[in-house]
């Protein structure tokens, strides 16, 4: 990627990746732990690259229109849901803000609940 001239990258992975593995419920680890581990490897690679990177770890993804109520968190346990549209909008903001380079964020929406 660096050889192609790419300078900025937003990587969207998931809750449970990297240092948030400890917060992933046992049931979720059993269901998709392997995929989370692979995403964690991608995060590790990116963190060692020369790119200006930002990592975004969404909670459980849900279809639907953006609520505008999604919140970002760093270094705190997060669970729940978030709309894909909110992840996209927030990701764009993070990508265009140079101050977020080298940072990892979780994103969830406290206004959403499982039916």
PLM features: residue spans?
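Oxidoreductase cofactor-interface core, primarily capturing Rossmann-like NAD(P)-dependent enzymes
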Residues: 3-115
